[in-house]
Each structure stands twice: as C-alpha cells, then as structure tokens.
Regions:
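Conserved phosphate-handling catalytic cores of large alpha/beta enzymes
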Residues: 171-173
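P-loop/Walker A NTP-binding region and its immediately flanking N-terminal helices
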Residues: 2-166
Length: 173
C-alpha cells in the first residue's frame, strides 16, 4: 500500500509523473526510439541524447524507460557538482560496474547536459565525453538545446528529438 502521507505531500509533477513509457502521451516516435535503444543496448551502443524544450517530458521518459527495463538509475543534474573529479568518481564507477540492487543494468542519466560550462562544472564536459567512450552501462543525456551540448559529446550520441505537440485523446463510451 502506498505511503499516503508521502503522496499527499508530493509535488504535483512527481505525483503524476508517468511510471512507464506506455503512459507517455505524445512524442510517440521519440518514445519508440528510446525503447528500441534500450531493448538492443550492448556495451558498444552509443549513448542516448534526449533533446527538447523544458517541461516536455524528457526526464520523465528517461525514468520511465529505466523502470520498464528494470534498470537502476544514477542521475546527475545541474544542482549536483559535475566537475571532472565528481564525474569520474560517481558516474564513472556506475557506468563501469554492475548494479548492487539486482537490477539488470544501471543507467546513468546526465540531465541538463547543455549546462556543463562554468566553474561549478570545470572539466565536466571532457570527463563526460571520456565516460561515454568507456561506459559499460547505458548512459542517457538530457538537454534543452542540442547546440548547448559540447560537440565532442554530441558526436558520440544517438539523438532523440522531443517536440512540442498537441495530443487529442478520445474516449469512446
């Protein structure tokens, strides 16, 4: 039974976040491309780069994909220090070792990959490019602006475009 007090205090977006890919409305081609990438993933597969406007569902789709695949998640975003040392220590270890919790794989999610500049992320873009070349686990990057992502990172990745669209659903009674 879910923890009702926890659910009552949850942020609306978290409370209603899609838990599985089939719960995502819109961006059917992007969702299909993500699922195919995950189902055929090998250690030689390119990392996935999700591109799209803020709030369109990229992070929700990434988390739903991990849940569908029973993959443990390590998420790094702009609120985390993403220096070279931190990326090598945390993400590097996760991308090259097996899961501790029985999940078949660990997916490293690097959110806001188009914001890897400045003092807080010193050396981060280079460390991520190195990580992507050596990862033995699935790595997924998320960005609002494809051209804000370092060219050395963008060249390595398979890109998935999320577009703003309108979904109209009809319920037949």
């Amino acid at each position: 039974m879910p923890d009702l007090q926890y659910m009552c205090n949850m942020d609306w977006a978290e409370k209603y976040r899609p838990q599985h890919l089939d719960e995502i409305l819109g961006n059917a081609a992007a969702v299909k491309q993500m699922a195919l990438w995950a189902q055929t993933w090998t250690a030689d597969s390119a990392p996935l780069l999700l591109i799209g406007k803020p709030g369109i569902g990229k992070t929700s789709a990434a988390l739903a994909l991990a849940r569908d695949m029973n993959w443990e998640v390590l998420e790094l975003n702009a609120s985390d220090a993403r220096t070279k040392a931190v990326i090598e220590r945390i993400a590097g270890n996760s991308a090259s070792t097996a899961s501790l919790f029985g999940a078949s794989r660990k997916m490293v999610i690097i959110d806001e990959a188009d914001n890897l500049e400045g003092n807080a992320d010193r050396g981060g873009a280079r460390a991520i490019a190195d990580l992507l070349k050596t990862a033995k686990q699935p790595v997924l990057l998320i960005a609002n602006d494809a051209y804000g992502v370092s060219d050395s990172i963008r060249r390595i990745c398979e890109t998935v475009q999320f577009n703003i669209g309108y979904t109209i659903s009809f319920i037949l009674i």
